[in-house]
């Protein structure tokens, strides 16, 4: 049993991947709450509840915005660690999502907003559906990656 830099990378990635899974689960719950808020016709006809709805939507979008940079940074750290460790297959599996994160970050709205998840645009049904599908896809990717990292960590520890 040998402790190598690759084994360390897989251990750290395993812990951080669990954090990313929780981030994405929180995003799915937040988008579901926005969808419920969007479709509730009783609250839309109540003017006293309208201000509360708007504040709730702004609060959720603000929290979603705060998770974007940490998620992208953690995934970028994965790629950097695997590149330094010479784990080319694992790096190759992570590059497509890294490129998507870079594309999504640099193609944010041109109105000068911080990143994305603007309350007005997120309440558009098409954008809300897109964001929710994106979160489900990321959850699948991170879950599969978690088990791949677990297997690779064990393999790296017992292979020498």
Swiss-Prot record:
Cytoplasmic side: 1-10, 94-138
Record SMART domains: Cornichon (SM01398)
Annotated disulfide bonds: none
Protein origin, superkingdom: Eukaryota
Localization in the cell: Membrane
Keyword annotations of the record: Membrane, Transmembrane, Transmembrane helix
CC terms in the record's Gene Ontology section: dendrite; membrane; synapse
GO molecular function, one term: signaling receptor binding
One matching Pfam family: Cornichon
Family designation: Belongs to the cornichon family.
Protein name: Protein cornichon homolog 2
Gene coding for it: cnih2
């Amino acid at each position: 049993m040998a402790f190598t830099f690759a084994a360390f990378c897989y251990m750290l990635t395993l812990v951080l991947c669990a954090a990313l899974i929780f981030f994405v689960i929180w995003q799915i719950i937040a988008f579901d709450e926005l969808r419920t808020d969007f479709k509730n016709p009783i609250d839309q006809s109540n003017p006293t509840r309208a201000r509360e709805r708007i504040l709730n939507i702004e609060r959720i979008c603000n929290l979603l915005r705060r998770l974007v940079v940490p998620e992208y940074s953690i995934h970028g750290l994965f790629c950097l660690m695997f590149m330094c460790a010479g784990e080319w297959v694992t790096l190759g599996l992570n590059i497509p999502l890294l490129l998507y994160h870079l594309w999504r970050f640099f193609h944010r709205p041109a109105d000068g907003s911080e990143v994305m998840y603007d309350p007005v645009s997120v309440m558009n049904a098409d954008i809300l559906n897109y964001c929710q599908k994106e979160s489900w896809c990321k959850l699948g990717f991170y879950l599969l990656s978690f088990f791949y990292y677990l297997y690779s960590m064990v393999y790296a520890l017992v292979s020498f």
